[in-house]
Each structure stands twice: as structure tokens, then as C-alpha cells.
Swiss-Prot record:
Keyword Ribosomal protein (UniProt): yes
Protein name, as recorded: Large ribosomal subunit protein bL17
The family this protein is said to belong to: Belongs to the bacterial ribosomal protein bL17 family.
Listed NCBIfam families: L17
Organism of origin: Ruegeria sp. (strain TM1040)
Length: 141
């Protein structure tokens, strides 16, 4: 029987799962949309929902709690400066999961997880900025 089985193990140790979801949460906060397997997306949703709730609180203790779950300071900054105010009036349901077919190779069910009122320009913004910087350096030479 599967009574009181609260989460998916995803064939990983506790430390590996913790690192996986920390990395995935950071990627979702940075890009506002990521593609992953359906079970990972379903497990990531409550983690992100709790992060947004912390960001809506906005105090120092909430910031430290979020920083303990995320690996990079820029993700914490975006969470509290951009995403928290964006979802101030929304009572939950900050992310959506869209099914995206099956992965070639192992037929794993794929999903796209994204923020509900996401900024479309956020996905790939870092890459575009980096390429523009490289192009500017090449033009100077």
C-alpha cells in the first residue's frame, strides 16, 4: 500500500533531490519557463509556490529562508524584487504545468512549467545580453 507516501523519490537520494529542485527552482525563476519531465514538474510546483509566498512576505527572515533553498543570490533578488510584487494580489496558483509530449529516446512524459503571468522576454535574456556584449567587443576591434 502507498499510504503516507508524500512525494516522488525520482530514483535519487535525499541530497540529490534537494540539489535537483534547488537548481530547477533557480532556472525557473531566472527563465520563467522550463521544460522538464512531468514528475519533476509536478514535484517542483509546491516548492515554487512556497518560494513565491515567501517573496510576497518580503521580510528579512523570508529572504533568508529562500536563500537557504536557492543556490544563487541573483535568483533570490529576482524572486523578491520582481516575482513577489507581481503576484501580490494572487492567492496561489502561480505556476502552470503544460504537457509537452514524450521525449525521444526513452519516451519519458515531458512538461513545460511556467509562471502564470510570465515575462516572455525573460527566457533567453541572459544569452541575448551575453551575445550582444560579445558583438560589441568585436565591433570595437
Amino acid at each position: 500500500m502507498r499510504h503516507a507516501r508524500g512525494y516522488r523519490r525520482l530514483n535519487r537520494t535525499h541530497e540529490h533531490r534537494k540539489a535537483l529542485f534547488s537548481n530547477m527552482a533557480g532556472s525557473l525563476i531566472e527563465h520563467e519557463q522550463i521544460k522538464t519531465t512531468l514528475p519533476k514538474a509536478k514535484e517542483l510546483r509546491p516548492i515554487i509556490e512556497k518560494m513565491i509566498t515567501l517573496a510576497k512576505r518580503g521580510d528579512l527572515h523570508a529572504r533568508r529562508q529562500a536563500a537557504s533553498k536557492l543556490k544563487e543570490d541573483k535568483d533570490v533578488a529576482k524572486l523578491f524584487d520582481v516575482l513577489g510584487p507581481r503576484y501580490k494580489d494572487r492567492q496561489g496558483g502561480y505556476v502552470r504545468i503544460l504537457k509537452a509530449g514524450f521525449r525521444y529516446g526513452d519516451m519519458a512524459p515531458m512538461a513545460i512549467i511556467e509562471f502564470v503571468d510570465r515575462d516572455v522576454s525573460a527566457k533567453g535574456a541572459a544569452d541575448k545580453a551575453r551575445l550582444a556584449e560579445i558583438e560589441a567587443v568585436e565591433d570595437e576591434e
